[in-house]
Amino acid sequence: MDRIRIVGGNELHGVIPISGAKNAALPLMIASLLTDDTLTLENVPHLADVEQLIRILGNHGADISVNGRRERQGESYARTVHFTSRNIVSTTAPYELVSKMRASFWVIGPLLAREGRARVSLPGGCAIGTRPVDLFIEGLTALGASIEIDGGYVNATAPAGGLIGGRYTFPKVSVGATHVLMMAATLANGTTVLGNAAREPEVVDLAKCLNAMGAKISGQGTSTITIEGVRSLSGARHRVLPDRIETGTYAMAVAMAGGDVILEDTEASLLDTALEAIRRAGAEISDTNNGIRIVRNGAGIRPVDIVTDPFPGFPTDLQAQFMGLMTRSSGVSHITETIFENRFMHVQELARLGAKISLSGQTAKVEGVSRLKGAPVMATDLRASVSLVIAGLAAEGETMVSRVYHLDRGFERLEEKLTRCGAHVERVSD
């Protein structure tokens, strides 16, 4: 099993290309099930979760082709992937596939809308709290679906004439449920209005792609999304937006290690709140022609309190990384997690490096220390794993991170991108 070895102490200098967003690519790939035409996606990252979803879509009958594992585009790498779901051969998403990745549950929306039925296993993925599927079920029921859960599967059936447009207000903001209902509603009869919808850039990106396919969606980026159903969708060509979580992660890595790095092929507007927190921590951040420049030279890391919130608030997917940064601050910071329960599993591993963190409910109190010391640590989930890498960049000596398959789910060529900027990071095999 692979591990990541980090020898701390090196500043970061250079250019890091930002990949396409995993959290945007996954729903875009699933949207290909809505049409019998070809959907072409550019800037698709090469990640374990993407490869797993390709297998799942193939199970449903999608024909998938990749133009070049690495297509050189300036200083970045990207893939162009073509999806053609001319014939849906199965409306069942089995446990052995869905259990490996939560987002694969989202196929329930397109399958139900296009085929009138779906049988989808309850999901897997990162073990962060309960992450219930109640909102998906309630929302699809509001569109006329009949749903029952039996033997670990969600069995959904549309009315004889197809799904029916309706109104549904999410009791809490859910990005995944917003994706699913928006996709399902594109082929429903009549108009659907989603209230308290997620406003994340990935939702806006999905709506942009669906509209290019012939959908009639408005209000994306606000808390009320309106979808006027159409009879069918066509193919389209769409470029996946930059990964704001990867952008924020590398910005925090520079703030932690010190240095001067340009993050290319990304946009500051995708993560304003997170970048402001990094500025307050002591980094200088400025826009470039094609990205963002992060500088921290000499100045220490200042303590900053943050609370995770749905977009445009501080992203929960950057909470662990920011905690890693705060372990070296010059004071006390408080990090409150409001999106997911049980998302502090990285705390005890950071403590192995010398961090001083105490928990009280959904808030972590981080007392900055003057030095961290390398140690063997274990990744517990995707975002927690990269927080250990960030801490390792500033730790004295060697940090060895095990269970790095978590990293491979969401970070494309992480060790390569850090190494090209001067970090001592390498993948080793047992």
From Swiss-Prot:
PTM annotation (2-(S-cysteinyl)pyruvic acid O-phosphothioketal): residues: C126
GO biological process: cell division; cell wall organization; peptidoglycan biosynthetic process; regulation of cell shape; UDP-N-acetylgalactosamine biosynthetic process
Enzyme class, broadest EC rank: transferase
Location of the active site: C126
Subcellular localization: Cytoplasm
Enzyme Commission code: 2.5.1.7
Binding site for phosphoenolpyruvate: K22, N23
Pathway stated in the Swiss-Prot or TrEMBL entry: Cell wall biogenesis; peptidoglycan biosynthesis
One Pfam family recorded for the sequence: EPSP_synthase
Residues spanning the signal sequence: none
Keyword terms of this UniProt record: Cell cycle, Cell division, Cell shape, Cell wall biogenesis/degradation, Cytoplasm, Peptidoglycan synthesis, Pyruvate, Transferase
InterPro entries: Enolpyruvate_Tfrase_dom, Enolpyruvate_Tfrase_sf, MurA_subfamily, RNA3'P_cycl/enolpyr_Trfase_a/b, UDP_GlcNAc_COvinyl_MurA
Single annotated GO MF: UDP-N-acetylglucosamine 1-carboxyvinyltransferase activity
Gene Ontology CC terms: cytoplasm
Family: Belongs to the EPSP synthase family. MurA subfamily.
Record-linked PANTHER family: UDP-N-ACETYLGLUCOSAMINE 1-CARBOXYVINYLTRANSFERASE
Protein name, as recorded: UDP-N-acetylglucosamine 1-carboxyvinyltransferase
Species for this entry: Sinorhizobium medicae (strain WSM419) (Ensifer medicae)
Taxon lineage: Bacteria, Pseudomonadati, Pseudomonadota, Alphaproteobacteria, Hyphomicrobiales
